[in-house]
């Protein structure tokens, strides 16, 4: 099953880099609409600070350290390590399981450079560009950390003008180790040295791109950057990891995390469990839902939708 899921993800990537005109926020907005249409509630600015356990059953969650929400089931899509830190002490989740989850290594994070382009100054590219410094396409912490050796360039589609790029996103790997000086800081409180670090990294990235014959310099109106710290603080992802827990195709069971937990009404989902990325998250959510609804029932329901 794992190999089949990976083949689906690879096929999806090879077939094309599809974009949402005017951004992917539309997907989140539509999901919110569907949830509300079915009687659900979506809460903003509501951080789960505790998963309440009593008599070895999850009773609900605590929001922002104050408000309690009772529930029959809890599904967590944050990193399993983060989920375990939120759990009340219980006899069902064994120390050996906690130690294994905590020992699993995460993938690298992403440094992202957003270029706001001058109006009608740079053509829209209906494809992604992948640039590599050499024939070795794999980014390695031991040999590549701190260096720009590869990146992806993606122009964002806009309904206002389909011929020119308004925003260009440039992504390059970055481990959180590079940001050790600011590990214990919060957004907007990291100081001038952090801003200088990001500016230097952006310059390095633009120079790397220029060495491949692409020069954005005269077309840039403004620049914005994010680091793995941004992803860590806004999404709760351990180490600001881009793809969650590392999966070894030679030994997949090492990084395997089940959607079920030893607490009967606590379930896990998200890219840390099976396959990473948008398609992986979708597949994993189906597996998690199947635990509640029944896999055969859900498969037929999807098949006849």
Spans of features found by a protein language model:
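A glycine-rich dinucleotide-binding beta-alpha-beta segment and adjacent secondary-structure elements
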Residues: 211-275
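C-terminal segments that line or cap access tunnels to active or ligand-binding sites in enzymes
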Residues: 118-226
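Active-site-proximal substrate-binding core of FAD-dependent oxidoreductases
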Residues: 47, 53, 294-305
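A conserved FAD-binding loop/helix module that cradles the flavin
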Residues: 271-293
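Helical element adjacent to the flavin cofactor pocket in flavoenzyme catalytic cores
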Residues: 11-58
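Flexible, glycine/charged-enriched surface loops at secondary-structure junctions
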Residues: 41, 45, 215-224, 299-303
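Mid-domain catalytic core of redox enzymes
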Residues: 19, 49-163
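Single conserved hydrophobic/aromatic residue that forms the stacking wall/gate
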Residues: 1-10
């Amino acid at each position: 099953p794992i190999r089949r899921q990976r083949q689906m993800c690879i096929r999806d990537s090879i077939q094309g880099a599809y974009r949402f005109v005017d951004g992917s926020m539309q997907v989140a907005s539509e999901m919110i609409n569907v949830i509300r249409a079915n009687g659900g509630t979506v809460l903003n600015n509501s951080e789960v600070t505790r998963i309440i356990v009593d008599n070895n059953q999850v009773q609900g969650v605590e929001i922002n350290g104050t408000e309690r929400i009772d529930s029959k089931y809890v599904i967590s899509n944050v990193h399993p390590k983060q989920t375990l830190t939120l759990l009340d002490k219980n006899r069902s989740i064994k120390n050996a399981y906690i130690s294994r989850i905590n020992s699993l290594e995460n993938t690298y994070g992403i440094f992202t450079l957003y270029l706001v382009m001058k109006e009608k100054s740079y053509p829209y590219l209906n494809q992604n560009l992948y640039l590599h410094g050499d024939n070795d396409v794999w980014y390695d912490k031991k040999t590549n950390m701190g260096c720009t050796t590869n990146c992806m360039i993606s122009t964002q589609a806009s309904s206002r003008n389909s011929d020119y790029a308004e925003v260009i996103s440039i992504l390059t790997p970055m481990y959180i180790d590079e940001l050790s000086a600011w590990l214990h800081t919060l957004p907007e409180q990291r100081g001038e040295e952090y801003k200088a670090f990001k500016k230097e990294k952006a310059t390095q990235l633009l120079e790397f791109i220029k060495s491949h014959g692409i020069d954005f310099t005269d077309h840039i109106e403004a620049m914005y950057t994010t680091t793995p710290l941004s992803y860590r603080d806004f999404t709760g992802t351990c180490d600001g990891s881009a793809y969650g827990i590392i999966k070894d195709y030679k030994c997949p069971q090492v990084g395997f995390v089940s959607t079920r937990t030893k607490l009967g009404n606590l379930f896990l989902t998200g890219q840390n469990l099976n396959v990473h990325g948008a398609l992986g998250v979708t597949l994993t959510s189906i597996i998690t839902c199947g635990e509640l609804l029944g896999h055969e029932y859900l498969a037929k329901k999807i098949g006849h939708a």
